[in-house]
Every structure is written in structure tokens, then in C-alpha cells.
């Protein structure tokens, strides 16, 4: 679904004016998806047995959340005029940001249920991602949404760089 949104963003938007915004959201969410599956092995590698409730709350809820984010990401279709693409995003972005914030909250809490300890920097970045995601709910200007996108991408990529440095 996210790949379909990405291809729609590439095909249906003008890159210079607004297309980069939708494409960057799709790209950073694809990177988050890959990051989740990469982290999954790190978190669950030592687990021999999960109860059904641990499975539902941890990996299953994460995958459902990632899917819902891809559904709620308001990428315009080919029938949306380029002049109203920003209004299209602003009118439909609240479910996307709520789901994104809830997913990061779940990502921050879930490792504790299986006894996985995160570094203080990982925890701090997880809370920062929640704040950045939640702030998108309250914005009234498209410029603010651009800032949230850049802040979200910077925080996520910064978190990944720090995790890479810690593991090296």
C-alpha cells in the first residue's frame, strides 16, 4: 500500500511545487518500515516463547499500525488538481498524524514487555518522535506540515545514526 502511495505521489504530483513533500513522506515511512523489521530481529532474537497477548501487542500491533499509516497518508490521486493538493493533505492529515504518534508510542513501550532494554538516547528519540508526530495534528498551515516532515525525517534518521554508532 505504501509503495502504491509512493508511485501515486511520483506520477500525480508536480515534483518542484509539492510532489517532493508527498514523496518524502512515502520514502521516510518506507525507511521506517524497513527499520522496524531490522529492529524486530534485534528485539526478539533472544525470545523463545511469546504469549498470544505479547504477540498481539508487540509485532502484530506494529504491523497493523504501519499498514494504517500507509492507508491514512493523504497522497492525492490523479484527479486532484495541483492547486489544491496542499488543502487535500491538510483536510485529511489528522488520522495520519494520530496513527503515527500512536505507533511511535507503541514502539517506545513494546520492547519493555519482552524485557528488551533500550538506551536512554533511543528512549529520548522515541518520545521526540511522538511529540513531532502529535504536533502535526494541530497545525493550520502547510508550511508547518513541511516543517513536521523535515523534523520527523531528521529525528528518525538521527536516531538510526545514533543506533548505528552505539552498535559499532
Functional labels for PLM-detected ranges:
Residues 20-43:
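A generic, lipid-embedded transmembrane alpha helix
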Residues 158-168:
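Juxtamembrane boundary at the C-terminal end of a transmembrane helix
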Residues 8-21, 45-50, 78-90, 138-148:
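Membrane-interface helix-boundary motifs at transmembrane edges
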Residues 1-8:
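N-terminal signal-anchor/start-transfer transmembrane helix
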Residues 44-54, 110-123, 142, 166-168:
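Membrane-helix interface and helix-disruption motif detector
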Residues 103-109, 127-136, 155-156:
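Hydrophobic, membrane-inserted alpha-helices
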Residues 58-126:
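Membrane-proximal helix-loop-helix units in multi-pass membrane proteins
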Residues 24-25, 146-158:
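Central hydrophobic cores of alpha-helical transmembrane segments
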Amino acid at each position: 500500500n505504501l509503495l502504491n502511495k509512493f508511485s501515486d505521489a511520483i506520477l500525480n504530483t508536480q515534483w518542484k511545487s509539492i510532489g517532493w513533500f508527498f514523496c518524502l513522506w512515502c520514502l521516510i515511512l518506507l525507511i521506517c518500515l524497513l527499520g522496524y523489521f531490522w529492529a524486530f530481529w534485534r528485539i526478539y532474537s533472544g525470545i523463545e516463547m511469546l504469549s498470544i497477548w505479547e504477540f498481539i501487542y508487540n509485532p502484530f500491533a506494529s504491523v497493523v499500525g504501519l499498514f494504517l499509516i500507509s492507508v491514512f497518508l493523504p497522497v492525492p490521486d490523479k484527479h486532484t488538481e495541483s492547486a489544491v493538493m496542499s488543502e487535500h493533505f491538510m483536510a485529511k492529515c489528522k488520522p495520519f498524524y494520530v496513527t503515527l504518534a500512536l505507533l511511535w508510542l507503541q514502539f517506545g513501550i513494546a520492547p519493555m514487555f519482552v524485557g528488551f532494554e533500550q538506551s536512554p538516547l533511543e528512549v529520548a528519540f522515541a518520545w521526540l518522535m511522538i511529540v513531532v508526530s502529535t504536533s502535526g495534528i494541530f497545525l493550520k498551515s502547510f508550511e508547518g506540515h513541511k516543517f513536521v516532515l523535515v523534523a520527523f525525517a531528521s529525528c528518525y534518521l538521527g536516531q538510526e545514526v545514533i543506533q548505528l554508532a552505539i552498535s559499532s
